């Protein structure tokens, strides 16, 4: 097994929910093989409170997560990226900066849990559920990604497999 560490950037427009969740999942489950980052094309400037609550509920420390611009990752001195995943449809349609390292890119669209409004009549349960489902959907995709033989697979096959992962929504899915 290689000692190589891969740099992975997750993008969504606001960098306040889905991309933050993805960054946290990969940091937690990546086994030290990955440096996970997240950013947005138009960052909101703060992480959605329900995203932080979802992470905290799972025992993930939240103090290091912040909403930031993707410009940080296109600037001189930024980490050379190996993979860039857009996780919202808006970011997938935008013209991205030139990333250092010429990373593989693909789209892993996840419904935006932040569009579910917390209501007082149910104690915000609908919004909590939306964030929980977004977390689980992203976790499934990241686990499929982590199972790929990155050190031994050819580039074309790897690109195809990470694209297929983005189309995967089923619990028991695999990437053939």
Where are these regions (language model features)?
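Conserved active-site segments centered on acidic
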Residues: 2-75
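Short glycine-rich anion-binding loops that position phosphate/pyrophosphate groups of nucleotides
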Residues: 16, 89-92, 112
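Short glycine-/acidic-enriched loop or helix-start segments at secondary-structure transitions
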Residues: 20-22, 48, 93-98, 117
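Alpha-helix C-terminal capping/helix-to-coil transition sites in glycosyltransferase folds
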Residues: 79-80
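Short, Asp-centered acidic motifs that coordinate Mg2+ and/or phosphate
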Residues: 83
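Redox-cofactor binding/interface segments in oxidoreductases and associated redox assembly factors
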Residues: 86-87, 107
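Phosphate-binding/catalytic loops
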Residues: 95-176
């Amino acid at each position: 097994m290689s000692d190589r560490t891969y740099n992975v950037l997750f993008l969504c427009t606001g960098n306040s929910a889905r991309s933050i969740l993805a960054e946290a999942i990969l940091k937690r489950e990546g086994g030290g093989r990955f440096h996970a980052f997240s950013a947005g094309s138009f960052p909101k400037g703060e992480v959605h409170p329900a995203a932080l609550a979802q992470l905290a509920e799972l025992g993930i420390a939240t103090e290091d997560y912040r909403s930031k611009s993707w410009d940080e990752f296109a600037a001189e001195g930024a980490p050379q990226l190996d993979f860039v995943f857009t996780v919202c449809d808006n970011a997938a349609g935008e013209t991205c900066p030139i990333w250092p390292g010429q990373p593989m890119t693909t789209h892993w669209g996840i419904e935006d849990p932040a569009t579910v409004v917390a209501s007082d009549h149910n104690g915000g349960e609908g919004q909590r559920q939306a964030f929980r489902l977004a977390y689980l959907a992203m976790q499934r995709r990241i686990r499929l990604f982590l199972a790929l033989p990155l050190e031994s697979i050819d580039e074309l096959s790897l690109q195809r497999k990470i694209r297929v992962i983005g189309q995967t929504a089923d619990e028991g899915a695999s990437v053939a």
